[in-house]
C-alpha cells in the first residue's frame, strides 16, 4: 500500500507542470502520516478532577503498589448512601470518600486494566484512562472490551 502511494506520488510529480525545483522531495513529505500525540508522564494523572458536567469531584492518587485509584471527594452524590451495593453491609455507607476506581496501570501512555464501581447501579465495570492535555483526561468504562462502553472527558480541578 505504501509503495503504491509513493509510486503514484512520484508519477504525479514527474508529469505535473510544476518546475522540478519547486516540487518537494518525497523523503520530506508526510504522505499518510498521522499527527503526533503529546505524551504525558505517568504521574500526570494524579490530582483532583471534575467529572463531565462537573457532577463530581474526584481525587486520583498513586497507591503503594504503583497503580492508581480514584476516590469520590464531592459533588451531587457525596451525601447519598451506597444503596445499590450488592453487599448489604455496604449499603449504609456514604459515597463520599469511597474508592470507585482502582488497579489502573500505566502502560504505553494510557492507564489500563482498571475497575470502576458504579454506585448508580451497584455494578463493577472495566475502565481505562488517558491524559489528553495538561488539564484534561478521557475515561472509558466498558464491559469485556472497550468497544462496548461509554467515554467521559474530565477536567482538572484548580
Segments (PLM) and residue ranges:
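Central antiparallel beta-sheet cores of small beta-barrel/beta-sandwich binding domains
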Residues: 46, 52-126
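Bacterial N-terminal signal peptides
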Residues: 8-16
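Short, compact, well-ordered microdomains
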Residues: 126-139, 146
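A short, sequence-level motif marking secondary-structure junctions
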Residues: 63-65, 130-134, 155-157
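N-terminal helix-cap/turn-to-beta initiation motif at the start of protein domains
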Residues: 35-48
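Bacterial N-terminal signal peptides that target proteins for export
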Residues: 1-7
Amino acid at each position: 500500500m505504501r509503495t503504491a502511494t509513493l509510486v503514484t506520488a512520484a508519477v504525479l510529480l514527474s508529469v505535473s507542470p510544476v518546475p522540478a525545483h519547486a516540487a518537494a522531495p518525497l523523503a520530506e513529505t508526510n504522505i499518510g502520516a498521522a499527527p503526533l500525540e503529546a505524551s504525558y508522564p505517568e504521574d500526570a494523572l494524579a490530582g483532583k478532577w471534575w467529572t463531565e458536567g462537573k457532577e463530581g469531584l474526584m481525587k486520583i492518587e498513586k497507591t503503594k503498589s504503583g497503580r492508581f485509584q480514584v476516590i469520590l471527594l464531592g459533588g451531587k452524590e457525596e451525601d447519598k448512601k451506597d444503596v445499590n451495593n450488592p453487599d448489604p453491609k455496604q449499603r449504609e455507607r456514604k459515597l463520599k470518600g469511597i474508592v470507585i476506581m482502582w488497579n489502573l496501570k500505566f502502560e504505553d501512555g494510557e492507564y489500563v486494566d482498571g475497575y470502576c464501581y458504579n454506585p448508580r447501579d451497584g455494578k463493577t465495570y472495566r475502565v481505562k484512562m488517558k491524559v489528553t492535555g495538561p488539564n484534561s483526561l478521557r475515561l472509558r468504562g466498558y464491559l469485556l472490551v472497550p468497544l462496548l462502553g461509554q467515554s467521559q472527558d474530565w477536567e482538572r480541578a484548580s
